Amino acid sequence: MRWLLLGTLGLAACTASGDGDVAASDAAGDDVFADASSSDTSVFADTGDADGTTSSDTGLPIVDGCAAVSAADDVDPWSMRPKSAGFGGITEATVGTHKDVFLDSPTKYVRVGARLDWGGTVVFFGLTANPKSNTIDANDTGRELQLALYDPTRIRQGCAVTASCATSLGSCANSITYLGWNPVQGGDECNRGAPVLSHGKVGDALELVIQPLQWNPDWDAPDCRTTACSGAGRPVDVTYRMRLRFVREHVVEVDTEVVSKETISHPTTAQEWPTLYVSNGAGGNPDLPVLLDSAGTAPSIGTPGNDGFYYGNFTSPAPWVTWQNSTKDYGVGLAMDQGIKAFQGWRGDGSKAPYFHNVRASIAFGIGAGATIRGLSYLALGGFGTVGGELDAAAKARGPFGHVDVAAGPIVFTKGSPLKLAGWALDNRSGTKIEVQVDGAIAATAAIDKDRGDVCAVYPGYVGCPKAGFEVSVPTTGWSGCPHVVRVIAKDSDGNVQVLGERVAQAG
């Protein structure tokens, strides 16, 4: 079962949309997280060496006093990530009445598992050799690690049909029974699982592609009817993609993507991106009742919500939190790549509501018609100290990502006139700078300070949004008439360096 504070969701409209450079398709092949390395253009740069010889710098042939140079092809910005910790293998197994698929860590010490008959939701994260070490609540189609989306104008049955909930919520009760538009990864309130369209190995990741179901099959009814659970669930015209990948022995990267095929847009509101339900002692698994922020402080979860649940909003000093057992030596952490430090915890006390614990980051965004939306989060296994150390290390290894939009291809320059470059970059913390190199030498720098709402609509919640863009002017005074390689680099405060794009510039 799922718990959501209803009637308090933001109503600001989301009007920006991404473009092909903001959310490009993944390159084919296994190494989907590799840096750009292939060549798209070969021309010649001045070396001072004689024609008919080879360049003393590059070893390439000299033609008209210019050595061959090339620029690497652009890559999908979403592939700009650290390499995985390795691949421990994928296995499938029947667990009770369910079909699950598991990805092992490189040493096979830790395992993460997804349920194929519940929309590929994460239902296991624990020790490979101990099935009773599971830190994830796998109670039903609404309680796992999963995605769920909302629309403030269609938040409740009765008013959802006319998209009028922002002005009047109507007469249906403030309960998850009467949720409106709400594609849920796991399935619906009848415990019918969402279908997994495909699953398998992509690079070192386990990929699952899902068509979510409306949580409430009666979501668009004009009244408060409740139809009996019979027949199939109601699929939504969006797809969820989840990729699970070990980036450290104890840390799984959770890569999520939503692609809408709808013709309607959904305004900005709070989303579950994702929500982590943790084990509650059922089935011999550990009970993890202690929620801690990154400083080890337990936030209050005592505000009454709907359906007898309690919640609490809080801020963590770092962008991660953890649910632990009573001795704080075993549990699971959730970190947000976007740098989000605001969280919301939920619980049921076993009296007014079933006994459960969950947490999610406080993130709000809209879903445009035909939009693509991407996000990253991380799960870490262990005691409080292990979780913190592992998540901090993963965050420091995560570098910037972005794209060079201008120029989109090879550049024709006029000697003495500056080159104009523009693009965007995001990172998991502030302080990232842009550097432009020409033939390997620094030629210009820039701040990331331009509004790029289109970028932040695809990658919502990242530090600095909506100011994700940069513009830079590169002087060409003193350049030779030969072609030059222009490389745009993002450097962050952790020392990570990422090439955003390369272009060949040739005199016109």
What is the meaning of each model-derived region?
Residues 7, 11-67:
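Ser/Thr-rich, Pro/Gly/Ala-heavy low-complexity intrinsically disordered linkers and tails
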Residues 247-297:
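Acidic (Asp/Glu-rich), glycine- and aromatic
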Residues 155-249, 263:
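Extended, loop-rich substrate-binding clefts of extracytoplasmic carbohydrate-active enzymes
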Residues 399-508:
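Long, low-complexity serine/threonine/glycine- and acidic-rich segments characteristic of extracellular
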Residues 307-343, 357-369, 447-482:
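Short, solvent-exposed, Trp/other aromatic-anchored flexible loops in extracytoplasmic proteins
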Residues 1-4:
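Bacterial N-terminal signal peptides that target proteins for export
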Residues 69, 73-108, 115-117, 317-399:
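Beta-strand-rich recognition/accessory modules
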Residues 63-183, 376, 381-382:
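Beta-strand-rich N-terminal accessory domains
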